[in-house]
Amino acid sequence: AKEIVERAVNLLDYFLEKYPHVERIGLTGQMHGIVYVDKEGNCVSPLYTWQDARGSICDGDQIPLTEEIRERCQIHAASGYGLVTHIYNIRHNLVQDSALSFCTIMDYFGMYLTGRKKPLVHVSNAASFGFFDSHKMCFEKEKLAEMGVDVNWLPDVCTGIEKLGTYRGRTVT
C-alpha cells in the first residue's frame, strides 16, 4: 500500500511542479479495499482489496463469515466489504499489533499528504465497508460489536467535503 501511495505522491508532485498555481487538491476514489494504520497515521499493512474472498470460504466445519453475518445480524455483507475483511483478520490474528484503525487507500493517501493521524472517510466509502446505516449515516456499532469488532477502530465519517490538511501549502480535501 505504501508503494501505491508513494507513486501517487510522485505524480502529484510532478503536476504541482508543472502547474504551480494550483491552490487546492481534491481527492476522490472508490473503496478498493482497506489498509491498517497505526497511532501516527502510518500504514502498517498491505492493501486488502475488495477481491478478498476469505469471508465467503468455509473455515473448518464453520459456515462462511458472510453467512454468519447474515444469520446473526440480519444484514447482507459481501466478502469484499472492508469490515468483512477486518472481522476475518481479527479472527485469524492477522491484524498488526501496532494497528489502531483502518481506511481506504485513498483516505490513507490523504493522511500521508497531510500528516493526519486518524482516518476521515467520506460516507460513500464508509458505506462500502459494510455494516453502515445509510439513513442514520453511521456504522451499525451494535452489530459490529456482536461480531467482535472494537468500534473504537472505526474511522471518522464525514458527509460533505472536509479539509484534511495541507500539502506543500495547498489545501487538501
What do the PLM-derived regions correspond to, one by one?
Residues 1-46, 71, 98-99, 145, ...:
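N-terminal glycine/serine-rich phosphate-binding loop of ATP-dependent small-molecule kinases
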Residues 52:
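Carbohydrate-associated surface elements
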Residues 55-59:
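A short, polar/charged loop-to-alpha-helix boundary motif
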Residues 62:
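Metal-dependent DNA phosphodiester-chemistry modules and their immediately adjacent helices/loops
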Residues 65-69:
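FAD-binding glycine-rich core of flavoenzymes that anchor FAD
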Residues 70-173:
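Gly/Ser/Thr-rich active-site cleft segment
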